[in-house]
């Protein structure tokens, strides 16, 4: 049901997305992970077998290495822009990454955890977004506050003044809650495919790469190995990158 909710949300079939999310949320087998009482430490992770909101894990973390304990270097660090989205009272701020800005949501060793999950909080986020587009943005904010109650120490409740404000707050909460879980690319496609700019440094030289608004490059190419196995498949048309 959660995958179906995600799929229909991506297709902008909002009533179906809501209905499938309802089925997940109404299943009393799962509960949102309460970070107030979780007792997580620097040696434990949000994605763990005792997390009551996780329904299914997949994709071994060996494919998703964040960093190795034998090294002081991380594959990537949490950006200042992401960090700025979290208030000081937000318990996710000390749960989703460590003091060195290394992602800390799941284990970085290939023997301890899976790297991807289906979990209850996504159902709330999917339903909240669908509710905004169904004209029920006040109910969407209620769903967001249900998540925030389990994540934030004080003053967890937010409000919205209109539909647009509610949608922005739903998307912001989605970015907070699902960071590092491979949702962002699909979310950006659904949010109008905005322009992206990234500066990369290599050997002292800096180069800025720009993904224009609405670019065909928002669709990733079909891997060469797949195309070689099935000659009928035609690759995605993408502009040349400079």
Regions found by a protein language model. Give the residues of each.
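Non-catalytic C-terminal accessory modules of carbohydrate-active enzymes
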Residues: 203-207
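A cross-kingdom marker of C-terminal helix-rich interaction/assembly modules
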Residues: 142, 147-149, 222, 229
